Amino acid sequence: MAGIALLAASCAKEATPEKEPITKPQITIEGGRLTPEALWAMGRIGNVAIDADNQRIAYTVSYYSVPENRSTTWVRICDLKNGQLEQTDEFVGSDPAWTQNGQLAYLKGGKLYFHVKRAGQRTEDIVLTGFDKDIEGFLLSPDNSQILLMAEVKTVESTADRYPDLDKATGRVVDDLMYKHWDEWTETAPQPFLAQLDENNIENKQLQVSNFVNLLEGTQYESPMKPFGGVEQWAWSPDGTEIAYTCRTKIGLEYALSTNSDIYIYDVRTRMRKNITQDNLGYDTNPSYSPNGQYIAWQSMERDGYESDENRLFIMNTATGEKVFASRGLDTNVDSYYWKDDSTIVFNGVWHATERIYQCSLHNGEWEIAQLTPDGQYDYEPCGNIGNTYICLRHSMREANEIYQFRIENGQCELNQLTFENKNIYDQIEMGRVEPRWQTTTDGKQMLTWIIYPPHFDPNKKYPTLLYCEGGPQSPVSQFWSFRWNFMMMSANDYIVVAPNRRGLPGFGKEWNEEISGDYGGQCMRDYFTAIDEFVAHSPNADKDHLGCVGASFGGFSVYWIAGHHDHRFKAFIAHDGIFNMEMQYLETEEKWFANWDMGGAYWEKDNAVAQCTFANSPHRFVDKWDTPILCIHGEKDYRILANQAMAAFDAAKMRGIPAELLIFPDENHWVLQPQNGILWQRTFFSWLDRWLKPVVLDPRETKCGETDPNR
């Protein structure tokens, strides 16, 4: 009996109690300016699901606790009445989706739940049973009789599998490429499981799936594709007889070298499949059927290996197989989309550094595009429709995501804000002003640059000024809101920010976007110098003696490169997750297609002029010209650009006698995602900039009157 009691006590000790969910933090902000703590107190609105029949919206919002260093995501259910959202329910979960019968399905802890209304106001959550894997995503068939479940499937033999007697060994034996991806060692692949579902059993308080079929059984292929793909890469036909899914049928070295994914149509009845995009060699992703099943749309890139190719909207007639490049003439990417009705698609795309919502409609046999949202300093993301009312997310450099609705009346867009998630914080702070400025580049072209001014801007004062270098490299400097690279945070610390849409960004035409691959040290760098030089020359408020240069990823590469070419312009540098040594990066990065395309080839290809130019411009080759303090930041779980790049840059600076700091995160990837690490990042960032860019007047008893610290 004593042994049983001891065992019971041991089990009880090992049991981990479920942590209390994080709720909306309450914060009082001193000084009326944005702080790192205020950033992490903000609610973050995510997924939006629309029940058009019942005029309801479900959306997620995440809250963070800095002391507990974790977050909780909540699902909110709201009725849309008279242009306002009335909250009717709230619970912990993610990935909400409405069923045909008006129930709400959602994920929590690797399980799928159905939030069910009972008599009166009572609700109940029914868990799906019969599936023994963690569910990472799901997609219900239109009639709810079938469901696709996303789950990880083991694809690599572990050391313990190979040597059962070495079950505590931590070493890995690797014999092919793609052994790591983004921030994980590749051991599993997400695959779609088709199952039968009887939603009527909800009334009996039970819901079970049966008759599983893994659409990729016996393969190591992914669907959806890692690292960021979700259920948007799957689609049901309206009658539930077909499933369209995205898949790159490659593994190992072949996978690492190619972006050639395809759209496959799986016949639920015969279990046969066909590839409808075999003729296209680049990415084909995110299929979606029209409501009547007459068309299927998807996003398509033309060239294999070019992950930043123009993302085109393609539409195929399901009866004839005729394909149409529907977004031809737009000269920018289609970023996300949905079918509004049988012949209308709503999507967003960036143009001149703002994400806008467009409509692609079939008229007289032709697909025609019209802009829906007005011009302005905002980014929009379409979510769906309730009748003729569009639901979208909107953010800007001055505001995090909020949900909006709009209607088109007499050719005009009438906008209405539905959520006010962070009003309690905005009401306590003053935001900086954002100004667009067109600048003439060294080759005579026009470049749009955002200028962000401090709050309470004094036109008679000079401010230290930062040149911001964007990552990607093919990512737009749009009206984004970041919880790390936040321009309002920089301006709140009394910095002017110069953020150019330099060469190699979408939203200014295909030619502009492509003028960076194979030319990292070329026109894009001249564009950076144009941006800061032109602003300093024409702004009496820019302190030309206290300029800084900051950036992440390709922006970090830019900082390392500029450090060896800036001709004494800058007094401080910060590089986050940047490339320092291009030759090492070519071999270290996991997605080799990117290295081959953007670098132009391998450094051992001596007759390849583009590749040789790329590697000749590696920042590490110009360390002898470094002369300015630099902060190097990196995450050790970053497998896109390894942390040894920052360590090498830091070591080089110290060995050259240049002031330098290194901030390393052992458990962060290409981003910084944990609250306390995020605040450490901000404090280190501004401490470094303030040290070198904000002159401090010394005690007049120790110096001549008005003399400043020469070390600043």
Predicted regions and their residues:
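C-terminal motif of bacterial Sec signal peptides marking the signal peptidase cleavage site
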Residues: 8-10
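Predominantly five- to eight-bladed beta-propeller fold
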Residues: 17-23, 72-73, 152-218, 246-249, ...
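Beta-strand-rich domains and repeat architectures in extracellular enzymes and scaffolds
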Residues: 37-73
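Conserved beta-propeller blade repeats
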Residues: 42-57, 89-105, 132-147, 179-192, ...
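Short loop/turn segments that connect beta-strands within beta-propeller blades
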Residues: 80-83, 116-121, 197-200, 267-271, ...
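Cap/lid segment of the alpha/beta-hydrolase catalytic domain
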Residues: 251, 413, 421-545, 552
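Active-site-proximal cap/loop segments of hydrolase catalytic domains
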Residues: 491, 499-712
